[in-house]
Each structure stands twice: as structure tokens, then as C-alpha cells.
């Protein structure tokens, strides 16, 4: 598309308020979904999901603007940025997400967005794919959901950091009373992180994906202090464990860091 967004229009909302919005999604969208999105594509989709209200029973059209999206994501506001965001929205409509349902033994294949419109002045209307409704709507009644503050994923620079962050949030079943942990074979972890096949060996996966993701999360996320452990059979790594040691491993604590349950508001 042409870079026709030549000037900023002030569609401003409080950026801090926007970044404090909660992203809630069914656990299957974190642990069983296969997709390959860029860092900014994940952030834009998280932003759109954060617009869903707790009581929504169907997807409403999300009304926003390229100005607002760039502001919330901390991007430089320019015609070039707006053009890139438009292409990001296009990719979210075209790129596949595959979610396997073990109960029905079916795989749902869909795009992230059903459709979107962008005006010449940069206003955006987007609608989430209807196939994602079971994973984003009426989560309180379904249970098995994970929530996080939008600002957490916005500040992460790597798509692998965001994927690992979401996995660790999903693993926090006891809201900080016991240290969350994920345990997988290197092969399973590579799939969950959507790592390329060239990172098939544990050494390469750790160097290029896992260690950098852990380092960035530990630096930027205030309630995460991730620690990596491996189990070996001979010289081969057969299991990977990642703990959030910000919380105690085995014993409960009297005053855990509070996490507001957005769905109970």
C-alpha cells in the first residue's frame, strides 16, 4: 500500500490506560496453537484482543486508529510506521493459526482477523475471526484461561520472549503460591516456541531462542525471574524445566503479589 498517512491525527486515548488493558485467552491458544507471527504481529493481535469486554458473547468490530496503535505499542508515529501497521493487519488476516482439539480430534485452521478496514485518515475497523470465539469469548464460564497485562508483551522485543512469557503465565495455576514451571522435551519446546527447523538441536535452540528469551524476561518483567534446568540421558538433554523463581518452589507464601482477575470484574 502507498504511504498515504502523511500526518498524525490526534485520536488519542490515555496510553497508560490502554497499556493496562488485560489480554485474556483460553489456554489452548497458548499451549496447543501453532502459528508463526512476527513480534509486532503478536503485539497488534494482543492489542486487539485486549479490546474484548468480559461480558462479550460475540465479537464486536474493534474501532481504533493507526495513531492509537502506534502510540500504545511505542512505535514512532510516521507514514512509514502506519504503512507497516496496515501490512501487519493484512498479515493477521492471511496468516494461519492451527488449534488442535484433543476431545473432538479436530484441527481448527483460521486466520486471526476475519476482516479489517483502514481509512485514508488512518482509522481502523477490525473484526476477529469467528473461529477464534471459543478461545476468546465467555472465558469465565469455560475456565482454563490465562490473562496478562498488555504492557508486559508490548515491552518485549523478541517473539520468542513473548511466547515464553505466555507459557509461563499459563503455567501459573496457583497465582504465585507455588513457583510456575514448564517441563518439555527440547523437541516439544521448539514447537511451542515456533522455532525454525534449523534450531532443532538443543544447543542451538538454547543459544538462539531460550536463553535470550529468559534473559529479556528477567530484565523487563517485574514478577518473573526465570531459571533453566535440564535433565540428561548420557550427554543428551531429554527434558527442559523452566521455573519462575520469583515465587517459592514448594511452600505457600502469605502475601503473594496480587493479580486482579479481570473476568470477575
Labelled PLM ranges:
Residues 1-265:
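Charged, alpha-helix-forming regions
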Amino acid at each position: 500500500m502507498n504511504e498515504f498517512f502523511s500526518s498524525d491525527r490526534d485520536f488519542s486515548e490515555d496510553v497508560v490506560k490502554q497499556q493496562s488493558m488485560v489480554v485474556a485467552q483460553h489456554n489452548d491458544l497458548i499451549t496447543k496453537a501453532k502459528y508463526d507471527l512476527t513480534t509486532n504481529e503478536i503485539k497488534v493481535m494482543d492489542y486487539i484482543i485486549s479490546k474484548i469486554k468480559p461480558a462479550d458473547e460475540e465479537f464486536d468490530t474493534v474501532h481504533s486508529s493507526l495513531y492509537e496503535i502506534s502510540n500504545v505499542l511505542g512505535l514512532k508515529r510516521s507514514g512509514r510506521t502506519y504503512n507497516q501497521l496496515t501490512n501487519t493487519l493484512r498479515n493477521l488476516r492471511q496468516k494461519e493459526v492451527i488449534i488442535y482439539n484433543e476431545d473432538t480430534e479436530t484441527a481448527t485452521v483460521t486466520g486471526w482477523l476475519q476482516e479489517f478496514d483502514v481509512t485514508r485518515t488512518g482509522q481502523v475497523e477490525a473484526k476477529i475471526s469467528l473461529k477464534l470465539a471459543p478461545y476468546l469469548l465467555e472465558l469465565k464460564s469455560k475456565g482454563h484461561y490465562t490473562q496478562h497485562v498488555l504492557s508486559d508483551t508490548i515491552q518485549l522485543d523478541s517473539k520468542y520472549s513473548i511466547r515464553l512469557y505466555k507459557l509461563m503465565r499459563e503455567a501459573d495455576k496457583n497465582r504465585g503460591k507455588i513457583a510456575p514451571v514448564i517441563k518439555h522435551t527440547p523437541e516439544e519446546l521448539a514447537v511451542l516456541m515456533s522455532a525454525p527447523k534449523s534450531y532443532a538441536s538443543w544447543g542451538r535452540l538454547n543459544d538462539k531462542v531460550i536463553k535470550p528469551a529468559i534473559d529479556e524476561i528477567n530484565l523487563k518483567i517485574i514478577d518473573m525471574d526465570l531459571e533453566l534446568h535440564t535433565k540428561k540421558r548420557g550427554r543428551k538433554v531429554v527434558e527442559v524445566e523452566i521455573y519462575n523463581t520469583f515465587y517459592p518452589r514448594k511452600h505457600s507464601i502469605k502475601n503473594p503479589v496480587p493479580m486482579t482477575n479481570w473476568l470477575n470484574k
